[in-house]
Regions:
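PRPP-associated nucleotide enzymes
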Residues: 1-334
């Protein structure tokens, strides 16, 4: 199976989307997206350990996984209470999935996991150009009418789309179907676009498919667009996350702006796999970025850099800031 997702249209009415509080429990703030005429449900969760993970690139190894446990478990509890998860089947898309504590969180919240499936895919190149993705390893289990649980970083989204299409085809061949799909992600706006389109496709042959429930940690970020290396000239298109055009959890925004360096990092999360397993490569990437900034310091437009990282022009009125942040429906004390 080879597939490459080419459409990158902007989300319709994104400027009209607002975040509204859903719950605040056990130190976890949860917000829901509304106003976008979505087919699916989208949430943003914010918690002290996930904020530390994203604001401190020196959090590495097992701590990357451990940082997500509290927020994930609390969201699992919420989804169980809302009856969004009944019988669960975990899909591990290697190796990004290994950073997400889905099985542990299900265990903590007394959600039975019927099976765990594993997949991996690799990029396909022709004449030095990426032409698609190919499934390299696959061990699938079919749990009819179940909730498929996935944890993955979504930047461009090609890997996720490729694997989901493969799984859905597999279920159809087995004469089975999925009730819904719950996705936990550190990811960007591209994920919303992709999942809306996928739900439309899936409902053609599974009309009763309830859709995706997507949980973003700390915000729905944006990727630098193709050909855009950022004001610094160092950023990687379709890989590096930043705030512009996204929706950021208020507590994460507040914590980041109360510190000196995190806002200017190359990426909100960096390479999740390297950060967990090839720590030396992660550290080298962080240092290479900051050394690159130092080398370019005299030529970088500081005002443009600040506006890029904040995601809006300066100066900005409070009313315009609320609108730009999608905070208009939040209590002003938040």
């Amino acid at each position: 199976v080879v597939f490459f997702w080419e459409e990158r249209a902007m989300i319709e009415n994104w400027k009209d989307v607002q975040i509204v509080p859903e719950f605040c429990d056990q130190g976890v703030d949860c917000y829901r997206l509304e106003g976008g005429h979505f087919l699916n449900e989208y949430y943003i969760v914010s918690e002290a350990e996930t904020r530390e993970l994203m604001n401190h690139p020196e959090v590495v190894g097992y701590e990357v996984y451990a940082s997500l446990v509290t927020a994930t478990s609390q969201m699992m509890y919420y989804l169980k209470e809302k009856k969004k998860i009944t019988s669960a089947n975990i899909l591990s898309i290697l190796r990004g999935a290994l950073n997400y504590p889905l099985e542990e969180s299900c265990y903590k919240e007394h959600i039975r996991v019927h099976d765990i499936s594993f997949m991996s895919s690799e990029r396909v190149f022709e004449n030095g150009e990426m032409t698609g993705l190919e499934i390299k390893y696959c061990k699938l289990a079919t749990v009819p009418n179940s909730t498929l649980l996935i944890g993955d970083i979504i930047a461009s989204g090609e890997t996720l789309v490729n694997c989901l299409r493969y799984v859905i085809d597999y279920y159809r061949k087995q004469g089975a179907k999925l009730r819904n799909i719950v996705l936990f992600t550190i990811g960007g706006t591209q994920g919303v676009e992709i999942l809306e389109k996928l739900t439309q496709e899936i409902r053609v042959y599974w009309p009763g498919f309830e859709g995706f429930v997507t949980v973003y940690y700390e915000g729905i970020f944006s990727c630098y667009e193709e050909g855009n290396k950022g004001v610094s000239g160092i950023n990687r298109a379709l890989i590096d996350f930043y705030w512009k055009g996204g929706i950021i959890a208020p507590a994460f925004r507040h914590e980041t702006l109360s510190m000196q360096n995190p806002l200017f990092e190359k990426c909100t999360i960096y390479d999740g796999g390297a950060r967990r397993y090839e720590i030396h490569e992660h550290i080298e990437e962080v240092l290479e970025f900051w050394n690159g900034v130092l080398e370019r310091a005299d030529s970088i437009d500081k005002q443009a850099l600040l506006e890029e990282k904040l995601g809006h022009p300066l100066p900005i009125s409070y009313e315009d800031w609320l609108k730009d942040c999608h905070y208009e429906k939040l209590d002003k004390k938040t």
